[in-house]
Amino acid sequence: MDSRLLIVLIPVLAAASWAVYNIGRVALQQFRKMTS
């Protein structure tokens, strides 16, 4: 495993997980509004 690859991957994975977290949270709020 190349250390340069990790240096690139870590911020990308962090950004991706942050985006998924935010999208999921908003989607849950929308879903709760629809079901209530």
From Swiss-Prot:
Sequence ranges on the Stromal membrane side: 24-36
Function: Loosely associated component of the core of photosystem II (PSII), it is not always seen in crystals. PSII is a light-driven water plastoquinone oxidoreductase, using light energy to abstract electrons from H(2)O, generating a proton gradient subsequently used for ATP formation.
Family, similarity comment: Belongs to the PsbY family.
Positions of transmembrane segments: 5-23
Localization (cell): Plastid, Chloroplast thylakoid membrane
Keywords: Chloroplast, Membrane, Photosynthesis, Photosystem II, Plastid, Thylakoid, Transmembrane, Transmembrane helix
Protein name as it appears in the record: Photosystem II reaction center protein Y
Subunit relationships: PSII is composed of 1 copy each of membrane proteins PsbA, PsbB, PsbC, PsbD, PsbE, PsbF, PsbH, PsbI, PsbJ, PsbK, PsbL, PsbM, PsbT, PsbX, PsbY, PsbZ, Psb30/Ycf12, at least 3 peripheral proteins of the oxygen-evolving complex and a large number of cofactors. It forms dimeric complexes.
Biological process per Gene Ontology, one example term: photosynthesis
Gene: psbY
UniProt membrane topology term: Single-pass membrane protein
Signal peptide: none
GO MF annotation: an example: manganese ion binding
